[in-house]
Each structure stands twice: as structure tokens, then as C-alpha cells.
Amino acid sequence: VRSLNSIVAVCQNMGIGKDGNLPWPPLRNEYKYFQRMTSTSHVEGKQNAVIMGKKTWFSIPEKNRPLKDRINIVLSRELKEAPKGAHYLSKSLDDALALLDSPELKSKVDMVWIVGGTAVYKAAMEKPINHRLFVTRILHEFESDTFFPEIDYKDFKLLTEYPGVPADIQEEDGIQYKFEVYQKSVLAQ
């Protein structure tokens, strides 16, 4: 795997979850953005892969599992087999990336998306690999019990624009948010 993409929505206190749900009320257009970004493959005949921890998987309503038109990989050291609906189970992010490099999947997968939770984001951001981070900043505070790890802004640079990502502030149901894209570029060793 040559590059990673992570996508997350955070509120102002860097919260990403509360009691297994999102800390804020449903934002339909923000969810559509997540669906569009993670589903759209740029290579004919290939699909994107989404990698997530077990809690993130079970936070998705059952009727929406697996995330459709994407190869769903769940990470867990405890589970013995992939949860119902998931395509693959891996013990760690490294195992999942090795799986994606296997002949079975290499020819089928375009982009690799990390969709949570905290530990999976942290492991991905620490890897010395090109990485784009798609952050929806919700411009309000909401009570949260799960948080996004600290972003190292020495590595991750905010892009001024990115194709397909609206630049202006969005608003739904009185909640304002904006889309940001950060990029970490690692020179080939």
C-alpha cells in the first residue's frame, strides 16, 4: 500500500464519538460527503477499501453494514472470525495493509480509507507513508467520550484546495462545519 487516506468528523473539543454514536445530531450532507469520498474509486473495475476498528464497525447501524461498494476490513485482536457482513478481519493495521498487498486484493483495490476509531487513526498517522487526512471540522462543542488523536502539523500540511471538496462553511440544522484536507508526504527511501 503506497498511500493512506483517513476521514473523520471532529467537533471543537476534538470529540469523534459519544456512547457509540456521533456526538452531534445527524448531518445528512456530511454523511453523503463521507459516502462519496470513501466509495469513489478512480480506477475502472476497482473498489476502495475501508479499514475500521471493531467498535466503529458495531457503531454502524446493522442495515448499513457492510459499507456498500467498499471492501470492509475490521481490526480486532479478540474476534476469531470477521463479524457478520464484514469482508475481512485483521489483527492490526499492519496485517490489514499486508492483506491489501496480497495478490487476491491488490488487483481489486484502489484507495485505502481509514474510518476509525482513535487507535486506528493514530496507528495510521504514525506510519511513514503518504497520507491524506480528510477532516470535517464541526464548529461547535459537543460532549464526547472518544477523541481524535493529536495531529502533527509538522507532518500534515493543510491544503488550500482539493478537487471535490467544498471550500466554504457548510450549515445543516443550525450546525456549521467545514471540510479540510491535510497531506503528509514521505520521500521515497
UniProtKB/Swiss-Prot annotation:
Gene3D superfamilies xref list: Dihydrofolate Reductase, subunit A
InterPro entries associated with the record: DHFR, DHFR-like_dom_sf, DHFR_CS, DHFR_dom
Pathway given in the UniProt record: Cofactor biosynthesis; tetrahydrofolate biosynthesis; 5,6,7,8-tetrahydrofolate from 7,8-dihydrofolate: step 1/1
Domain of life: Eukaryota
GO-annotated biological processes: dihydrofolate metabolic process; folic acid metabolic process; one-carbon metabolic process; response to methotrexate; tetrahydrofolate biosynthetic process; tetrahydrofolate metabolic process
GO cellular component: mitochondrion
Enzyme nomenclature, EC number: 1.5.1.3
Catalytic activity: (6S)-5,6,7,8-tetrahydrofolate + NADP(+) = 7,8-dihydrofolate + NADPH + H(+)
Pfam families: DHFR_1
Binding-site residues for substrate, renumbered to this chain: 30-35, 64, 70
Positions of the DHFR domain: 3-184
GO molecular function annotation: dihydrofolate reductase activity; mRNA binding; NADP binding
Assigned keywords, A-Z: Methotrexate resistance, NADP, One-carbon metabolism, Oxidoreductase, RNA-binding
Xref: SUPFAM superfamilies: Dihydrofolate reductase-like (SSF53597)
Binding site for NADP(+): 9, 15-21, 54-56, 76-78, 116-123
Family according to the record: Belongs to the dihydrofolate reductase family.
Function as written in the Swiss-Prot or TrEMBL entry: Key enzyme in folate metabolism. Contributes to the de novo mitochondrial thymidylate biosynthesis pathway. Catalyzes an essential reaction for de novo glycine and purine synthesis, and for DNA precursor synthesis. May bind to mRNA.
Protein name (record): Dihydrofolate reductase
Gene: DHFR
